[in-house]
Amino acid sequence: RGNLKTGATQIKIMGGGGVMSDFDPIHSLQPSPAEIRAAVQAASDWGTYVLAHAYTAEAITRLVENGVKSIEHGLLIDDKAARLVKEKDAVISTQLYIFRKLLVSDYMTDFQKEKADLVRAGQENLIRLIKKYDITTGFSTDFIFGEYAGLPGEFTERALFWSNAEVLHQATAEGGEIVRMAGKLNRHGDFGEIREGWVADLLLHNGEVLEDLSVLANPETNLALIMKDGEIIKYKP
């Protein structure tokens, strides 16, 4: 409630252990079911939802059973938990590129590196289950290493597992769907699709992205136009 008072549009809780944390193992379960329900009730009272950091199937199951609507990361999910996510109309907001490419650093402790290796090993299973149950998944920016670090690389990483059109749908329509889960607290309006009456946020790139997603991975050279809410912010022919 304090975070909502200061302007939060949705609430994030930590559902289990983290890679970069110094003390908690990945398998640890953190909030109790009652604590999760209390957070969900507080968010619901304001017309919004709760998202949660979680890797393991056990954490995901506890969170979703108690009302959490978005799982951040989710790399160690199993079939039963994935089916539950779908049944409860929850989503998985994950990152692929950063775990395979960026989450390897000399400044990480041995404990952190062990945890990174553990969650990285679950990536292909997560992808398989997202496909199997047709779970909504957006492009998450829930990571470190600078503002939006590695986000352009997410396009080419996902293209290893999905068609270019599917990847674009995840980054736009599905991402918009997730943000709109904030309901009455959604400050962005209807966006994520090109549709009459919706927010006119558009990017134009020099290249055919349905044929080559690497066009999107190099915005410094390929991004020709940025339109924000109908206003041209950048134009470079």
Which residues fall in each region the model found?
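Alpha-helical scaffold segments that flank or form the walls of functional sites
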Residues: 1-12, 41
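Short alpha-helical functional segments enriched in proximate histidine and acidic residues
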Residues: 2, 177-179, 226
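Receiver (REC) domain switch/active-site residues of two-component response regulators
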Residues: 9, 69, 201
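Active-site core of metal-dependent hydrolases
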Residues: 14-124, 132, 136-138, 205-206
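Active-site/binding-pocket entry motifs
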Residues: 17-19, 98-99, 176-177, 209-210, ...
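Short, well-ordered secondary-structure micro-motifs
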Residues: 24, 104-106, 149-151, 180, ...
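His/Asp/Glu-enriched, well-ordered alpha-helical/loop segment
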Residues: 45, 49, 120-208
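C-terminal cap of metal-dependent C-N hydrolases
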Residues: 186, 191-237
